[in-house]
Amino acid sequence: MDLELMINSFPKLLNAAVITLKLLSVSLIIGLFIGLFFAILRLNKNIFINRFAYGYSYVFRGTPLLVQIFIIYFGLGQIEYLRSTVLWVILKEPYWCAIIAFALNTGAYTSEILRSAFQTIKPGIIEAGKSLGISNKVIFYKIQIPIAIRQSLPAYGNEIILMMKGTSLASTITIMDLTGVAKYIISTTFKPIEVFIVAGGIYLFMTFIIHNVIKFLEKKYSFN
């Protein structure tokens, strides 16, 4: 075991972890809005709107994240029309292609998490709001959404951790995130065990932080 290599690799891998966290945070923010939008569509009684939202969720939850990244990065770039549009400014960059793939993927899972949370809200809470003369719009934004978010925290916390680990796939399209830098160091030192132990330790630490933040939020916003 080369301890010197592990010590020397740590600062480089720690800096790369910043890229991983950027990928994760931007993807989660965009994915949360996408998830909320499609969760609302899934609750719509219109069968066409409902099926459309279900189709999106089914496709992105039913296919590997790696395939989605490759289709967006390699596949869309082969469409001649897209190369002549403003979209090409974004699609030609590996970073933004990864963000799009991650956001769409986590958005699909988030939509199902939020949909389930909305459905667990007791009708009596909504009826109580209506009896006080509160409009449906205010009830939805001020009562239903906050309750749904609180209800979904445990499941969404797991999704954040899964997404954090999923960002390692960004290295497959040349992004030098934590896994990407680890691969580069391994290619020059030929010592994968030491490098991946350090990288794995950093991933584990980030998981520990995320887990405890979610746990804190659960307690803080507990209905009890």
PLM region descriptions:
Residues 1-224:
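Transmembrane alpha-helices and adjacent helix-loop boundaries
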